């Protein structure tokens, strides 16, 4: 008997699952929208919701717990400053999961995971900054 059936194993070891969810949570906080498979999306939602709640709590212990979960100080700063302020009046339900069809290669169900009331400009921000830096370097070299 499997009492209290827990999370999905997703055909990975426990350490691989933990690392994958940490990376997915970091990507979601950075870009505010990611595309992944539906089972992964359903598993990442409670993780990120708890991180946002930590951000709303705002104390030092909560910050250290968030750092141990996503391992990126800049993203923790965004979580505690930007996202906590954005969702200060909302009690849960910070994440939206929308089905997005099926993947071409293996027909896996896809889903878009995004923050409710997300910042549209956050997606691809790092790529735009990198491209602008490369173009500035090329202009200086020429």
UniProtKB/Swiss-Prot annotation:
InterPro entries: Ribosomal_bL17, Ribosomal_bL17_CS, Ribosomal_bL17_sf. GO terms for cellular component: cytosolic large ribosomal subunit. One of its GO terms (molecular function) is structural constituent of ribosome. It comes from the Bacteria. One of its GO terms (biological process) is translation. Transmembrane segments: none annotated. Keywords: Ribonucleoprotein, Ribosomal protein. The keyword Ribosomal protein applies. Part of the 50S ribosomal subunit. Contacts protein L32. Belongs to the bacterial ribosomal protein bL17 family. PANTHER family: LARGE RIBOSOMAL SUBUNIT PROTEIN BL17M (PTHR14413:SF16), RIBOSOMAL PROTEIN L17 (PTHR14413). This is Large ribosomal subunit protein bL17. It comes from Brucella anthropi (strain ATCC 49188 / DSM 6882 / CCUG 24695 / JCM 21032 / LMG 3331 / NBRC 15819 / NCTC 12168 / Alc 37) (Ochrobactrum anthropi).
């Amino acid at each position: 008997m499997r009492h209290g059936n827990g999370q999905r194993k997703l055909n990975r070891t426990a350490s691989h699952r933990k690392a994958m969810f940490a990376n997915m949570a970091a990507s979601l906080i950075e870009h505010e929208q990611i595309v992944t498979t539906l089972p992964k999306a359903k598993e990442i939602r409670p993780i990120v919701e708890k991180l946002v709640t930590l951000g709303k709590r705002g104390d030092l212990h909560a910050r250290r717990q968030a750092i141990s979960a996503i391992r990126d100080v800049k993203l923790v700063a965004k979580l505690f400053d930007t996202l906590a302020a954005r969702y200060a009046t909302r009690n849960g339900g910070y994440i939206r999961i929308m089905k997005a069809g099926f993947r071409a290669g293996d027909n896996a169900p896809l889903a878009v995971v995004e923050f409710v009331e997300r910042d549209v400009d956050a997606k691809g921000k790092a790529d735009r900054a990198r491209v602008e830096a490369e173009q500035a370097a090329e202009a200086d070299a020429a």
